Amino acid sequence: ETVSVPDEDQREKFLGFHKILEKLFPLVHEHLQKTEIDGNLIFYWKGKSSDKPLVLMGHQDVVAAEGEWLHEPFSGDIEDRKVWGRGSADTKCSVMSFLQAVEELLKEGYVPEQDVYLTSSCTEEVGGNGCPKIVSELKRRGVKPYIVCDEGGAIVQEPIGGVKGYYAMIGVLEKGQGNLLISARSNGGHSSYPPKNSPIARLAAFVNDIEKHSPMKASFEKETEAMFSTLAPYGPFVYRLLFGNLRLFKPLLVKILPMISPQAGALLKTTVAYTMQSGSDGRNVLPQKATLNLNLRYIPHQGMKESNDAIRRIASKYDLEVEEIGCYDYCEPVDIHSSAYAQVEQVVNEVFPDLPVCPYVMTGGTDARFYQEICDACIRFSPVVYGPAQMKGMHGLNEYLDTYSLPGAVDFYRTMIIRNH
């Protein structure tokens, strides 16, 4: 059990997991240089050259497992050709697969052409400082990775509605995110004589303003355009018509996509979600302070500052205060025409020859963002199959991974190491 909890020292819990890794991967621990930083791991495999270091990464920590499960959430049961348990899909599958890949290569006496780093943080799920500690150590050593490969994209079933089959979705752009705490104040009072423009009424008007006149601009990033263009030939006729002719239909799609699909709309603009609210403690008491939390996911063409400023302008109309909490901007996109991206695409084609490869825009967050300062090609791709059941179970009930996914994942990481020369 490696559930991470914010602001708690849980190093001992993760050291227990590390002892299991020592038993499972003895050659890795014998031949690679291991560094442990507060439960976070770095394994260094010296290659013949240090010119193009490769980082394979995945987090050890998982979210809590609540509710009634078909199998105990930390049992690791293997049944019905599935590995059951919290973390099986998110993302111990990646950690175990790249460790197994290196274990096999060591057994064969293989020496990598380039340096290899296997890294794993223990605070990803709580947005902690585990990965920054790893990156800080790599910076201290002067390591500048050629490619970083983290979670994010995967082998996805039906990536957008109507496009059937499986696709290797390679994450190349990660949206930023942040929270804005909106506060409305008053003198409070009794609910029997409510004034106009009470705190909750002002918050309601504020939300209504955003919903009716959204300040967030929809537009196609070049990575989003590449994603839809790549998937177009595999969709029904209307997809091939619209997405195969984006230059012609882009103005129309910018308007209709957010209305048709929230998922597609999130690829085109900064999104605003209302997640938490508070008022008074009494049913008949007007609050002296009411709050509303907005969770934003920032798109490059309207980044963190511009998006937050747009919200501030609307908030000022209703005499509301705005506090930024944990905001960070979008990640610099990976150049899909770069040699690094081409190398990953080549490996996917070699290991999974029947899978179309497609760039992917990520609306969620990963640890890979911390590597931006030392690497230009932070790829988000887990080489396992994620269908609807995996997507539903990752932070929910009955998380599992199909066992048939694992040999391909190991082969992918083996090939990533071998082809990096």
Report residues per predicted region:
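Acidic/His- and Gly-rich active-site-bordering loop/insert found
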Residues: T2-R86, K107-Q114
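An extended, acidic, His-containing surface patch that forms the Zn2+-binding/catalytic region
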Residues: H29, K34-D38, I42-Y44, S49-D51, ...
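A common structural junction motif
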Residues: Q60-D61, I210-P215, R312-L320
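Short, solvent-exposed loop/turn segments at the edges of secondary structure
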Residues: H71, E113, V143-K144, G165, ...
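Acidic/histidine-rich catalytic neighborhood of metal-dependent amide-processing enzymes
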Residues: V83, A89-M169
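A short core secondary-structure module
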Residues: C131-E137, S192-M216
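Hydrophobic beta-strand positions in extracellular immunoglobulin-like domains
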Residues: A184, L296-Y298
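Short amphipathic alpha-helices in soluble, non-transmembrane regions
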Residues: N197, S307-A315
